[in-house]
Amino acid sequence: PAIRNGWYVVCDPDADLVPNEFVQVCLKDGRCTIKEFVGINGGVLSLLSVNGGERFFFEMDEVESITAITDIVPPSQHRQEHPYSH
C-alpha cells in the first residue's frame, strides 16, 4: 500500500487538488478517508481507492472538506519539530 501503518500523512489545506494525487476527504457524517482524487463533475466527487481499483462517488453536499496530501513520511524520517520553527 502507498500509506503504511505508522507512517505520517502531511495535508495542506491551501494546496490545489490535483487529479491522480491523494486527498483527505471528510464527510459531514464524521467519516474521513484518504483516496486518490479523480475530480468533481456535476456536483459529484470521484475518488479511487489508494490501493487502486475501487471507485467511490460522493455528492458534494455530503462533503465537509477535501484536503490535498502533500507528503507521506515514513517513521524514520519524521521530525517532531518543524524545520522552520526556529
What are the residue ranges of the model-derived segments?
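Acidic/glycine-rich C-terminal interaction modules and beta/coil loop segments
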Residues: 1-86
